[in-house]
């Protein structure tokens, strides 16, 4: 499945409580890159929309928050999504994880429009930006694997990863690996970056990069 049926809208989701922290700084760089490409992009802080976790809706009502608005009105219509999260205990933040967990309320068979939700969840271009205190390359692999498997499960394309290091607010700008430039490029190229994920029977050219 490809993303040809999706719009060219980008949604950037920040799973940090800090509006001026390193995850938010990465998100702003992604937004700047999207603006350079003329991409319609919107940024959302997850804790403005999520204030509770997934519940057993057979016996309890969902949290009275704005998650449904975020998921149905902003995430589903977007053709691309970039998740920006700090590294907490070698995983994504609780806000970010709750975004995925809460979606079950809308794609489970109990939801009247579940089939439509399935279709609109699929075929997106997915990116990930992680801010951590550690420069250890393996620190973020748990998050990377989760986003990779979400993309696979939803027939989406995981097209880019940015991992930057910083502790104090904005310190990520001093990371010599220049993650802010990488984030800017991810935002600029979210709909154009080449993507390949071969299987044994995938038709392919003998060249990766065409002239």
Regions found by a protein language model. Name each.
Residues 1-108, 112-113, 173, 177, ...:
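N-terminal beta1-alpha1-beta2 submodule of the flavodoxin-like/Rossmannoid cofactor-binding fold
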Residues 12-13, 64, 129, 133, ...:
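A short, mixed-charge helix-start or loop-turn motif at secondary-structure junctions
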Residues 17-20, 133-137, 167-170:
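Short histidine/acidic/glycine/proline-rich micro-motifs that form metal-
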Residues 112-159:
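Short, glycine-/small-residue-rich phosphate/pyrophosphate-handling segment
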Residues 160-165:
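Beta-strand-loop-alpha "switch" segments that mediate conformational coupling across diverse proteins
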